[in-house]
Amino acid sequence: MKNLTVLLKTIPLALLLFILLSLPTAAQADVTNKVNYTRDVIYQIVTDRFSDGDPSNNPTGAIYSQDCSDLHKYCGGDWQGIIDKINDGYLTDLGITAIWISQPVENVYALHPSGYTSYHGYWARDYKRTNPFYGDFSDFDRLMDTAHSNGIKVIMDFTPNHSSPALETDPSYAENGAVYNDGVLIGNYSNDPNNLFHHNGGTDFSSYEDSIYRNLYDLADYDLNNTVMDQYLKESIKLWLDKGIDGIRVDAVKHMSEGWQTSLMSDIYAHEPVFTFGEWFLGSGEVDPQNHHFANESGMSLLDFQFGQTIRDVLMDGSSNWYDFNEMIASTEEDYDEVIDQVTFIDNHDMSRFSFEQSSNRHTDIALAVLLTSRGVPTIYYGTEQYLTGGNDPENRKPMSDFDRTTNSYQIISTLASLRQNNPALGYGNTSERWINSDVYIYERSFGDSVVLTAVNSGDTSYTINNLNTSLPQGQYTDELQQLLDGNEITVNSNGAVDSFQLSANGVSVWQITEEHASPLIGHVGPMMGKHGNTVTITGEGFGDNEGSVLFDSDFSDVLSWSDTKIEVSVPDVTAGHYDISVVNAGDSQSPTYDKFEVLTGDQVSIRFAVNNATTSLGTNLYMVGNVNELGNWDPDQAIGPMFNQVMYQYPTWYYDISVPAEENLEYKFIKKDSSGNVVWESGNNHTYTTPATGTDTVLVDWQ
């Protein structure tokens, strides 16, 4: 159906009234699609700080601050408070279709020596029990039911990197990092005969390796190469998947091995596929190729710190401009295989609030408009719509100040969240810069024949916009924001040229057309990794109501369900590797391919491979390559590494934790690569190893 604003010029009044009364305000969010969030808007909630719906479960004593004057302590927010704000329409009217809640598991009860508490949910004690200050399992079930019945998905935070604060020399420090399995002590930090934890001191963040195998600050760091810990954490997340969660945000992914996390994702996707994204913090202007590699290879998306930091630099302090922002958009589309699955934001619990005291809220409004019309999965931090202020932790975690539905930002979010549900260009479309200078950025998102054109002026003077071209068809277009940010109408000519117009100072306009696509067009595939038999969901347009077929390259997959906009299939029994997916409708019309789905050899386990006496010259690194897809299929360009040699083992012994197929007879060798790409192979026979069905292992061999 064409954009209503284009039709207004020609429809008789009586017919127009009928259409307005019949038209839904937004497409209903599909809570059954747990792997595609590209058209959703996530609302991040620090559970303890949002709303106290049940005072009877509040803490007592030293860990509780009743008036929340001590932001390091519990303040009383709980799941009932979230339920209440769903039921009274605050979140649904805002257009929220997913909530990201604090880790729901039981956390430590002890007061940290510095006066801190576990209100934030990141100091886990027992992953198979709830945090009683948020609620019990029946409360959690009610939260899930309430959210789902209102078209809202639920994402949980998850911390498989560490338990809680601990000191090796002081068992009385907090709770000594103790971790429990449904009430039964597994172990603690200072008495660790089963080696559940790393005991390598704290990281100085000097290298990727150092940040993985040493403690993050004073947090007891799990040894994820320990089979007990590996199985406990994987069992625990399955418990919450069985409780109905729709997504997972994984904390501190930079501080765990990619190999173990890939095995975790394989486990999740085999059990209950849900959208999963991790936190890999990047500072302002920081670009990390390892970050891109992780997002492309681990099976997990990431919080898009490049997006978040750049938009803050443009609109908070002016240290960057729209040229820098556009460059970031272009480069990340190249660097991330699935850029539309990266989770975008303007602020969160680990950085200062976007709004700050004694400043205009206008740039917050502009930032929200850009966030909600850009590629990626947009996330709103609780209270941003109320212009909450605050510096770094804990000031950025103040209690929710108000639930006012009349703020400008609330209206902007509500309007654009609805547009995101209705127009697939915002979820699936590519980004094209159409007009730019330091103050002005006009960009277009398109998918099939659906188009959204957004114009932003962050400067203090208006601009005359000449020579703007667009993919919008001929017609007049009104501002979808309805002048919330001083937008205007535009006229598009038959050749795509837009008539000259004035773009207001600190103004934003959004123009759009929504067109159904007649032939099949894939917008999203999720997850993008899986073994034979796993379920994969394909969303897009023009698939038709009658069942067609889905191809992985030229191999047919079993169709589990089919509709015009969503298909579920089973990964076919094909050789492990990367495949391009296409949809063929019942009329034999075939879609363009959706590239690089990875078929795994089978279930995955994380194994530490190590090699002694591998001496190298400066600038040369060690890699591993072998006989399965997960080891590069003997292709040195796809070898795994570079390997490590500083913490768990020291040079000339090298090691790396790698996700490999379970119960598989592996053959492999180590190779040396210099900075020019020259390769030196090991001599002798291939190393051999049969992987276990579950758990972890370490394999140590000598260089040949």
From Swiss-Prot:
Cofactor annotation remark: Binds 2 calcium ions per subunit.
Chain ranges of the IPT/TIG domain: 520-598
Site-annotated residues for Transition state stabilizer: D350
Reactions catalysed according to its record: Cyclizes part of a (1->4)-alpha-D-glucan chain by formation of a (1->4)-alpha-D-glucosidic bond
Cofactor: Ca(2+)
EC number(s) stated in the UniProt entry for this protein: 2.4.1.19
GO molecular function annotation: alpha-amylase activity; cyclomaltodextrin glucanotransferase activity; metal ion binding; starch binding
InterPro entries per the UniProt record, alphabetical: A-amylase_C, Alpha_amylase, Carb-bd-like_fold, CBM20, Glyco_hydro_13_cat_dom, Glyco_hydro_b, Glycoside_hydrolase_SF, Ig-like_fold
Intracellular or extracellular location(s): Secreted
Family: Belongs to the glycosyl hydrolase 13 family.
This protein's domain notes: May consist of two protein domains: the one in the N-terminal side cleaves the alpha-1,4-glucosidic bond in starch, and the other in the C-terminal side catalyzes other activities, including the reconstitution of an alpha-1,4-glucosidic linkage for cyclizing the maltooligosaccharide produced.
Name by which UniProt lists this protein: Cyclomaltodextrin glucanotransferase
Lineage of producing organism: Bacteria, Bacillati, Bacillota, Bacilli, Bacillales
